[in-house]
Amino acid sequence: MKKKIKIIGAGPTGLITALNIVNKSDFEVELFDAQETVGGLAASVNIDGMICDWGPHIFHSAHRDITDFWLKNFGDLLVKKDFFYKNYKDGIYYDYPISWESINKFPKNIKKKVEKEINNLKPENLMRARNFKECVVELVGPTLQKIFFEKYTEKLWGLSPEKMSPNWAPKRIELRKKHKAFWSGQFSACGKYGAGAIMDRMAKTIQEKGGKIHTKHRLKKINIIKNKISDLHFENGKNYKSDDSIVVSTIPLNNLCKTMKLPCDLMFNSVRLMYMVFSKNRIFPKNTHSIYFAHSSFDFHRASEQKQYSDTTFPKGKSIIVFEISYTQRKHLGTMSDKELSKRILKQFCSLGFVKKEDFLSAQSVKMPNVNPVMKIGYEKELSKINSKISKVDNLHLAGGSAEFIYGDIQTMVARGNDMADLLISNHYAINKNLKRSLQFKFNENVEIYGHKIGLNHPTMVIAEIGINHRGNLEAAKKLVLEAKKSGCEIAKIQTYKGKDRVSNTSKEAKYADKTLGMEETT
């Protein structure tokens, strides 16, 4: 009997997982998605023949296998180019990410203050940071933190940086000497006809190879019998027997919990995209693709000119600005009509001098209630509690950023989809330690580590976890080893790495980390 895989969510992770499975096995694969089209957050919208993404999506990677995947399968649908962003602050457009060129634009007194703070940074203080704000202060100093991070972070996530987990803060912030492309040194491209065209091709290939895709299927309820999903119930009234299937969820974790009647206090940020059409050939300066706005006087936190990403579907004399508006806490921005909100946005945008009121042609919006996880201080406890309950369901797996409650862009979703598919089709699926087991097996009752026997009838061994590389401070590492010994620990565990990267560039974890943003550390 063929193994059956049911995937909830036909976004990038779901599509990549399914594509790999149909390419490498004869398994029966079905995808279910709530929307009319596939793609999830990487879908596109057609506005009078002009194709726009649900917020610009970049296909970038420093990993050759991911780059080769894009080029081999979708090369004709990609526009390879560099992308440049700006940060608006008090009438001045600074480079994003921050560069010394931008810092040199500061008034002399502020510039000297920034230089002094950066010169006095102590890397070892980063490990003591208790929240997002303290992390950023230890990376760039209090002045740059206040100018570029504090207000923007609160505006985007609807949460004060002091209340956000240090795990969500960048692990490093590169201060470039000169303004470079955002993904400088990496392959980077955008969709020639929008990211949605690439998602559509994946879906078509899956179907051509026997996979099934069910759109307009929003998951309503999951029945679980004896720690196994027995049935999937959808809002359209259709039900699917699943006790003979492996179910992979890629939908937001809070939504999955709702279908399983699990309490969940985890939160995602909500973003409304406002597409505004203007009678101008180009609106932003050339090679300015997106601009970030921290000021509370602007409802939007980012504005992007889709035509500068790809102009293939755009006529002369027209362009579209995509405004990203977080309404996680500013609920009124999520409930306004398109007419009311676009009127506000137009007035704010005109004040910047890019357009005049008479240039405006039309507007429409789309709401995305679950974009990225909001990592409040202490979220780990809630996440651990939920994962412990979900892990008891033998035939359920989670894959992707929303499902695993982690940050991730398209390149990381490709890596996670690849890995999930490889694990599912592995001959060792039933006993692989990274997966739930559908068959019972016994662990070793006794093991030996460095001459210490561990297991039944042996004393408990205590291993001290003393950290990773200690910022290159060998003396600090030695002191921790000695303290571990004094505390009665049998073994002290220390991890090291060389160069700029924590792990090999080819390892699985390395592909999960966005090294440009520094939002995830590799282990």
Describe these PLM feature segments.
Residues 3-31:
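N-terminal Rossmann-like FAD-binding beta1-loop-alpha1 element of flavoenzymes
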Residues 22-46:
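Glycine-rich FAD pyrophosphate-binding loop
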Residues 24, 218-339, 343-353, 386, ...:
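Mid-domain catalytic core of redox enzymes
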Residues 44, 97, 306, 312-440:
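Conserved flavin/dinucleotide-binding core of flavoenzymes
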Residues 48-124:
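Dinucleotide-binding Rossmann-like beta1-alpha1 core, especially the glycine-rich loop
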Residues 102, 108-110, 114-225:
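Active-site/ligand-binding neighborhood in enzyme catalytic cores
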Residues 441-463:
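N-terminal amphipathic alpha-helix/helix-capping segment at the start of soluble metabolic enzymes
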Residues 490-523:
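Glycine-rich, proline-tolerant flexible connector loops at the mouths of alpha/beta enzymes
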